[in-house]
């Protein structure tokens, strides 16, 4: 068993003002995505300025935050938030959904594309390789917060999390997700998007790979207490939400290569 590193979730405390590592991870993800996007901008559209790119990143970030919060409300704990709607605004208490954030990003991308003469999938293909930076940073934030841990296990790398009332050795599922959704997904999309691909293919690859990775990790991750398993003693809400991503991603890739020749890389 490995010892859990006791990291204070509060990174900086200035009197009553407390800045948490989880919030800083959002900044790392957004900043890293902007930096990488700026390096790829000329290949995407040489006429775009850094200011326009910053606008895109801003609206995508808003989509992540608003969509992530509302997605958690609707997908994971709807009854509790309907009973007390003011809880929706108490974001410091936790509760963000990747799938809600993805919907928020898609809406923000569609809106931004309409205003700037770009199709939805042109922008999504450009954005997709940037997303794993934020995903990886977010999972590190989950690990520091000692939340979203895995099932009890006797593997050599199991950890006892301080927030676990049972104090059992568990899978560090946050680190599994960091490795898969962050490192592996970034590597796949980075190399896949370096070569010319038809529009929609990069978006499809992102959706399919993320869906598969998340579906796998859900087998060792403890489901949200208020939901538990939804069917057959193992199916979680996360897995249900990943199924359309996997099927839709595969469908997008197949359709992309069928409908058009390869164009410039995103």
Swiss-Prot record:
Q: Where are the transmembrane segments?
A: 10-30, 56-76, 92-112, 120-140, 172-192, 200-220, 234-254
Q: Name one GO cellular component term.
A: plasma membrane
Listed InterPro entries:
Lgt (IPR001640)
Q: In which pathway does it act?
A: Protein modification; lipoprotein biosynthesis (diacylglyceryl transfer)
What pairs make up the disulfide bonds? none
Q: What is its EC number?
A: 2.5.1.145
Main location per UniProt?
Answer: membrane
**GO BP of this protein:** lipoprotein biosynthetic process
Does the record bear Cell membrane in its keywords? yes
Which residues of the sequence carry a binding annotation for a 1,2-diacyl-sn-glycero-3-phospho-(1'-sn-glycerol)? 139
**Molecular function GO terms recorded:** phosphatidylglycerol-prolipoprotein diacylglyceryl transferase activity
Family membership noted in the UniProt record: Belongs to the Lgt family.
**Function, as annotated:** Catalyzes the transfer of the diacylglyceryl group from phosphatidylglycerol to the sulfhydryl group of the N-terminal cysteine of a prolipoprotein, the first step in the formation of mature lipoproteins.
- NCBIfam families annotated for this entry? lgt
Name of this protein? Phosphatidylglycerol--prolipoprotein diacylglyceryl transferase
What is the native source organism of this protein?
Ectopseudomonas mendocina (strain ymp) (Pseudomonas mendocina)
